[in-house]
Amino acid sequence: MLRWQTAGESHGEALVAMIEGLPAGVRISTDDIVSALARRRLGYGRGARMKFEQDKVRLLTGVRHGLTLGSPVAIEIANTEWPKWTEVMSADALDHDLPREGRNAPLSRPRPGHADLTGMRKYGFDDARPVLERSSARETASRVALGEVAKQFLDQAFGIRTVAHVVALGGVQTNPDLPLPTPDDLEALDASPVRTLDKEAEARIIERINEAKKASDTLGGVIEVLAYGVPAGIGTYVESDRRLDAALASAIMGIQAFKGVEIGDGFLEASRPGSQAHDEIVVNADGRIDRLSNRAGGIEGGMSNGQVIRVRGAMKPIPSIPKALRTVDVLTGESAQAINQRSDSTAVPAASVVAEAMVRLTLAKYALDKFGGDSVAETRRNLESYLASWPEHMR
């Protein structure tokens, strides 16, 4: 069983991520993880923090000479700003009082759309600092690091590869008639400031981001993650909590600021008649079973069906807005303007990288549940045996 967990605060000493249950023999390096984290910092409209946020990574456990050992893999991502926050975020009690100013000033004006107010109520804080430190999207760096480990496992054991791109940002839609990106388009997507292959839409999106920045506002959008090479039969229909589409939806909704998910054509399917909503089954020129379309997004009955898996997520505009919204100061009970933490005009392109990491982790878990194996070689043999058990025309 594959499990993962993250720990750490936005301005704490480090983020820590751990993944347990990974087979032995997965090739992984510190450089792989550093490169993945660099992709998370890309994207037009990112804030000032991205200019100096450098991710110093250490593989602490579970890897020897570039290969996983089958034991838990732990990763540390150091915070390069830690010296500025040593006292404010100290784990140990201080032997002196800190002035309630500067970085230690109480954050008593919760931001609408953030975890601030409800987190303060839930955990009994009179200051939003403890809430925003953990609820911050900085935590997603941990998940991107774990997602890189999952990427290597999926590719080496199953030949599964993924790619993510932006399909809408700030109300600007990319052209739906363009071919879907493939993993071979990764370099071109990384080169795009808004992670799209649609150059016309790219220019209009950049213009919208510039407008939002001038207006001290923020923008949301829609991302899509595609998974290629996923064999049929991952996930199951027998219990609702083991359905692959349910797990993918949960993984995307667990990313900060995401408010909607669809698999395949998703909500469009609700407006179509049944005769136009499903993917007809045919025998292709090679004598094998095939489909005429992929409206289901590669998942039917909670199981992968062998087609490309398509998952979309809708991200709301970042609620840390320079043009601060109305709130209430919880210390005085009076109306006030919300605190304005350093933020981005949009983080949709970067969020696509996070979403891709979560899809990878979910697919890795469900693929391992299906095929098992204590080593990559054993997992690969199990996959080959499974595929060989099908009649020739069903492969």
Curated annotation (Swiss-Prot):
The protein's name: Chorismate synthase
Details of cofactor binding: Reduced FMN (FMNH(2)).
Cofactor: FMNH2
Keywords: Amino-acid biosynthesis, Aromatic amino acid biosynthesis, FAD, Flavoprotein, FMN, Lyase, NADP
Residues binding FMN: 134-136, 256-257, 301, 316-320, 342
Originating gene: aroC
Class of this enzyme: lyase
Record's GO cellular component terms: cytosol
Family: Belongs to the chorismate synthase family.
PANTHER family from the UniProt entry: CHORISMATE SYNTHASE
Binding-site list for NADP(+): 40, 46
Physiological role: This reaction introduces a second double bond into the aromatic ring system.
Pathway participation: Metabolic intermediate biosynthesis; chorismate biosynthesis; chorismate from D-erythrose 4-phosphate and phosphoenolpyruvate: step 7/7
GO molecular function list: chorismate synthase activity; FMN binding
Presence of the UniProt keyword Lyase in the record: yes
The keyword Cell membrane appears for this protein: no
Gene Ontology biological-process annotations: amino acid biosynthetic process; aromatic amino acid family biosynthetic process; chorismate biosynthetic process
Region (Disordered) location: 99-120
Subunit and interaction comment: Homotetramer.
Catalytic reaction(s) noted: 5-O-(1-carboxyvinyl)-3-phosphoshikimate = chorismate + phosphate
EC number, UniProt record: 4.2.3.5
Disulfide bridges in this chain: none
